[in-house]
Amino acid sequence: VAGGGYIWHTTGSGKTLTSFKTAQLATKLDYIDKVLFVVDRKDLDYQTMKEYDRFEKGAANSNTSTAVLKRQLEDDNAKIIITTIQKLATFIKKNAGHSIFDKRVVIIFDECHRSQFGDMHQAITKYFKKYNLFGFTGTPIFAVNAGVSKNPTLRTTEQAFGDQLHTYTIVDAINDKNVLPFRVDYIKTMDAEPDIDDKE
């Protein structure tokens, strides 16, 4: 866990609560200066902040711009910061010599399977000197479903974050009655012409 890793928890199983507790516990470690919780969309930024506030009012800080993010990174009282991948990317690009890059930072990515993570991963490893990287996902990318990537060393979730630290799959959640079971029905809606090539 010292270097990081990823947590595979199915949708609806409480990933946000787990990530909040992870962020909260990290801030209690004397040697951790900041915890960044990174989401990939603005609506998730707002949603995560609302959830975190529900767990503990005022425990986390969100931001509306890169300038606000910069102020929060410089504020010793702002321990947990929720931001978007876009704001963090802009901050890194515009503040190459910033003091945060020399501090001990835990960076937690929500939905760490997203495609734009590759560029952010390179920026983090280039600028941050002392970081721990964790990812939460309901749909990890494995070698068998990785597809093509600009960076072949970051094709899978494991390549980007390290070891899988915990798993709670849809089967686990259904068995525990934490999510409802579902059934897939395939319905044939029309008969295909036998001599039509699907590739056409």
What are these regions (language model features)?
Residues 80-123:
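Conserved RecA-like ASCE ATPase "motif II neighborhood" in helicase/translocase motors
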Residues 54, 67-81, 98-99:
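Conserved motor-coupling elements within RecA-like helicase/translocase cores
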Residues 10-11, 113-115, 127-146, 177:
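Conserved helicase ATPase motor motifs in RecA-like P-loop NTPase domains
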Residues 8-9, 33-41:
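Conserved RecA-like ASCE P-loop NTPase motor core of nucleic-acid helicases/translocases
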Residues 1-5, 33, 78-79:
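Pre-Walker A (Motif I) flank of P-loop NTPase domains
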